[in-house]
Regions:
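Non-cytosolic coordination micro-motifs
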Residues: 1-39, 73-179
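Compositionally biased P/S/T/G-rich terminal and signal peptide-adjacent segments
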Residues: 46-75
Length: 179
């Protein structure tokens, strides 16, 4: 599913029909000192292929809730991130290792990472950040985050809770008063 797909749309294409959506708040303090609840949700499911067993977590955020607390149904939650834990199955001889995946799949397909911090190979393009790391000989972890959704969150917070945003909201509210 593309970034910003809403929760119901993504749920309709997940192969596992027994998924449970978990909702939680992520509190964030603005520069002005306001504590905001950022509405988040996540879905976990498993996918098994010929060579791997994957545990996939899809992370969603409700940017619209920052603008108005009435925007709280599932269609307002948009895809923000994906985390995969990939376990390599026993392939006999030759046995694939996490190092093989990093070397022959990640580096060959994505090239030199923008950054390597000693643990994570970090790639970035205009839309997302892609991070991959070796957990052990048979397990890797992949994290993908949408930069566009992150910017949407920052813009919504700035639009609503900055000094200019608060003044703008006050002007809109005053327009509704007849004197």
């Amino acid at each position: 599913a593309p970034w910003e797909s809403n929760l119901p749309a993504v749920l309709s294409i997940i192969p596992d029909t027994t998924v449970e959506v978990i909702y939680h708040d992520d509190n964030r303090t603005t520069n002005e000192g306001f504590v905001l609840p950022i509405k988040r949700s996540s879905v976990e499911f498993q996918y098994t292929s010929r060579l791997t067993h994957e545990q996939i977590r899809l992370e969603f955020v409700n940017v619209d809730f920052i603008y108005s607390t009435t925007n709280n149904n599932d269609s307002h939650f948009i895809l923000e991130g994906i985390t995969k834990k990939v376990k390599l199955k026993d392939t006999g001889f030759p046995q694939l290792t996490s190092g093989d995946i990093i070397k022959h799949k990640v580096l060959m397909e994505y090239g030199t990472p923008r950054e390597f911090d000693g643990v994570w190979h970090i790639y970035e393009d205009a839309n997302s950040t892609y991070k991959v790391r070796e957990l052990d000989e048979r397990n890797i972890k992949v994290e993908i985050m949408s930069l566009k959704v992150k910017k949407k969150i920052e813009k919504a917070i700035d639009d609503t809770y900055s000094k200019q945003g608060i003044e703008y909201k006050k002007r809109l509210m005053v327009q509704g008063i007849d004197i």
